Regions:
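Catalytic-site signature of metal-activated, phosphate-bearing donor transferases
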Residues: 1-36
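Residue at a conserved register position within TPR or TPR-like alpha-solenoid repeats
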Residues: 25, 64, 98, 142-143
């Protein structure tokens, strides 16, 4: 972590450093620092790679969930989907969020949208949960709860 912090200080305009540092703060459960750094990442002029921006938005949503700001989390999930609509991860995390709210039409919409994406992007941003059983499981739960067994 000290090296990431140093890199972010030495290159404050480098979006990758800001993204990585924010992500690491999130992994360590330092929600406030994570949020601050991820917001900084999104505000940087050179922060233009949609996949990385969408990941920062998903991480911001996770920070919001961990600090009890569910509605704000949903806004970040929506923004992540809008930023990178060709990536499954935003849809799957949004579907998971809706499952926690028992919003079964929302779960179905987001999980089916994720499953409609069949080409896995070849970047490090991919997360296994989006390409394994999770979107299928969420979709099945939604169908069951909606009486479409």
């Amino acid at each position: 972590m000290p090296l990431l912090e140093l890199a972010a200080r030495e290159e404050p305009e480098a979006p990758r450093c800001a993204h990585y540092l924010g992500r690491e703060y999130m992994y360590q459960g330092d929600w406030n620092k994570a949020e601050e750094e991820l917001l900084r990442h999104l505000a940087l002029p050179r922060s233009t790679w949609e996949a990385e921006r969408a990941a920062s938005m998903r991480y911001l949503a996770r920070c919001c969930l961990e600090t009890g700001r569910r509605k704000e989390a949903l806004r970040w999930f929506y923004r992540a989907v809008a930023e990178a609509p060709s990536l499954r991860e935003g849809y799957v995390e949004c579907a998971w969020y809706f499952s926690q709210e028992e919003n079964w039409p929302g779960v179905l919409l987001m999980s089916q949208s994720a499953l409609a994406i069949t080409q896995r992007d070849k970047t490090y941003i991919n997360e296994d949960f989006a390409w394994g059983s999770v979107p299928w499981d969420l979709s099945a739960l939604a169908f069951w709860h909606l009486g479409q067994k």
